[in-house]
């Protein structure tokens, strides 16, 4: 996996540092839901049972560079 500088910077935040890389990898490979944004970025969600929350991972249009990853408080499992 590749990462943007933005992702690496945001990963330093206390709330983001708790997100395990294995969760990000699993979300990218086996999402519960995914959509393509108008700018071509790919959003993928996966329920992280350990946390009881959905993790959203945003990939650049190349499909392999992680731009953002965070627990999505508004996503409830439906397609957006």
Give the ranges of each region predicted by the language model.
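Ribonuclease/tRNase effector modules and their secretory precursors
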Residues: 1-80
């Amino acid at each position: 996996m590749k990462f943007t500088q933005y992702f690496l910077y945001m990963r330093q935040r206390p709330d983001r540092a708790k997100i395990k890389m294995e969760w990000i990898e699993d979300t990218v490979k086996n999402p519960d839901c995914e959509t393509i944004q108008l700018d071509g970025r790919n959003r993928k969600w996966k329920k992280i049972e350990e946390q009881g929350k959905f993790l959203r991972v945003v990939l650049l249009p190349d499909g392999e560079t992680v731009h953002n990853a965070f627990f999505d408080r508004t996503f409830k499992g439906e397609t957006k």
